[in-house]
Amino acid sequence: MDGQATEHADVVVVGAGPTGLLLAGDLIEAGVRVVLLERRAGQSNLARAFAVHARTMEQLQIRGVADELAATGTTIDALVLYGRAAIDLSRLPSRYPSLLITPQSRTEEVLTRRLRRLGGSIVEGSEVVGVAQDEDGVEVRVRASDGAARRYRASYVVGADGVHSAVRTALGLPYPGRSVVRSLMLADVRLTDPPADVLAVNGVGDAFAFVAPFGDGWYRVFAWNRRHQVDDTAPVELSEVREATRRALGTDFGMHDPRFLSRFHSDERQVPSYRVGRVFLAGDAAHCHSPAGGQGMNTGIQDAANLGWKLAAAVAGWGGEALLDSYQAERHPVGKQVLRSSGLLVRLALIRPRWGRAARNFVVTALLGIPPISTKAAGVISAVGLRYPAPPGADPQVGTRVPDVALRDGRTLADALRGGRFVLLGPPTGDLPEPVDAAEPREGGERDRLTLVRPDGYVGWAGAAHRFPGWSQEYFGRGTGRRPGAASGTVGPSRAGSG
């Protein structure tokens, strides 16, 4: 590498899957110089992820691409578990009270188009072979597909490069966990006698399967047969998928004409820390789990939405260590919870004794028939119910998700948040720091009370209007990203403020 020219950037993002694409786009929109590296040379045809949950759609709405993605798939309003038990998504307090079924490749295409509209690009065929950091920045060494060596220098690096993350490996981070299910089969097929338009999941001890419609005549099938365990590299025959599906769901729905067949194994793993100095991990590079519930890609996108504005603040010079550390504090517990919930779905599906399966079906159906429990389950799996921890003494609103609302100026809150802005909801107030825009809800709200919404759509501060000027001057003006008081909450600006 001696004599090799070094390209400089504010942030290097490694991995151009959904997590890296959304993050890179957010950073570029905030005025950050970004290099996005991708080992692949072209689009992947492997798309295990297919479910886009409500909270992810809300994040995409903030970025102006939700409708574009929605047009590529179909929506379902219930997640069917173990026969009759179902999680009702239709009552979610969201503009998107459903689950969008579309291949991950479509999500990547939509986010790639957004990236390019913002002036970004992907450096394809770039394999990371080394990462080294010091007090001032991070150096990333890359081997291009033609064998050429390249070097990048940035203030921060984000590894969003999947389960086999080169960034995580270069850091020497452990990825503790275990394999949960081996020899899982994945198929995209047509069905002669398709099921109802819901995501169906069931297990009978020796077999597990679920089926989801793409909406264009194709169906995604995951299937597993305990009696037929082979290496991941073994080719998949459609007959194997049919047999496992029949065992789990009672029928193979007349599946035929496969356009894609694959075999893989499912792990449950999570790194101890999402941050090591100036290097961060997001998406599957930080956590992986079973596909049950369809939360993997969604969790990665939420990682990116959380991290992007914080890195932009740091690059601008005022987002300090406490703000960057809040990424670990807020997102690591979410990853752990997703591991638990998706793992529970699989373990319940794989109960072997007949009496155990009968008990499972009875208990799960009964529990989901209780409205508060059903509402909680829908909020957890969709991430609409997610709340970030707030500091002691903070206003009860701090850390909560803010639903999209209509504003008096004709926009919605999602419109106002676009571009990584903070939005101060409430009655008109005085001068604001540069990162903050004022907006008044068309309906509701309290006189003399303000709510500061972070760029990712969560409450960062709330309280009496007369308290905001002093708080914001200290917070946005100091350039520290530290909370000045107990009422502040987990918030940080995206550009230096004037106070």
Please place each PLM-identified region on the residue numbering.
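C-terminal helical "tail/cap" subdomain of flavin- and related membrane-associated enzymes
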Residues: 313-403, 408-422, 427-435, 447-456, ...
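Short, well-ordered loop/turn elements at secondary-structure boundaries
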Residues: 205, 275-277, 284, 418-420, ...
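Core Rossmann-like FAD-binding/catalytic domain of the broad FAD-dependent monooxygenase superfamily
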Residues: 1-358, 364, 368, 488-499
